[in-house]
Amino acid sequence: MKVHKGDTVLVVSGKDKGAKGKVIQAYPTRNKVLVEGVNRIKKHTAVSSNERGASSGGIVTQEAPIHVSNVMVVDSDGNPTRIGYRVDEETGKKVRVSKRNGKDI
């Protein structure tokens, strides 16, 4: 999967189209990513109390994963771009490259 944790992405389709956010978690086996502030859902949790008597539960708002095809990585210029790879001559490792401007990501 070409989108990694910590990348800044732009949502290109869906109800949050146009929103930018940072990838909190990537799920490569499911081809999904969790983006900060995008695809917020309300989760209903059971009310329970701990040993001090404080109650927790109710309605919690949190992010839900979205499919990786609905996001594009934002490059160093702030534009959405596709991702390519090249082999670094010094280290011999694969490096992600912006298809828009050719710079490393």
UniProtKB/Swiss-Prot annotation:
Gene Ontology biological-process entries: translation
Subunit structure: Part of the 50S ribosomal subunit.
Function according to Swiss-Prot or TrEMBL: One of two assembly initiator proteins, it binds directly to the 5'-end of the 23S rRNA, where it nucleates assembly of the 50S subunit.
Gene3D superfamilies reported in the protein's UniProt record: 2.30.30.30
Short name of any one Pfam family annotated for the protein: KOW
Family note: Belongs to the universal ribosomal protein uL24 family.
Protein name: Large ribosomal subunit protein uL24
SMART domains listed in its UniProt record: KOW
Highest taxon above the source species: Bacteria
Cellular component GO terms, alphabetical: ribonucleoprotein complex; ribosome
InterPro entries referenced in this protein's UniProt entry, alphabetically: KOW, Rib_uL2_dom2, Ribosomal_uL24, Ribosomal_uL24_CS, Ribosomal_uL24_KOW, Translation_prot_SH3-like_sf
Name of encoding gene: rplX
Native species: Mycobacterium sp. (strain KMS)
SUPFAM superfamilies, per database record: Translation proteins SH3-like domain
Keyword Cell inner membrane belongs to the record: no
Matching PROSITE patterns: RIBOSOMAL_L24
Key words of the record: Ribonucleoprotein, Ribosomal protein, RNA-binding, rRNA-binding
GO molecular function: rRNA binding; structural constituent of ribosome
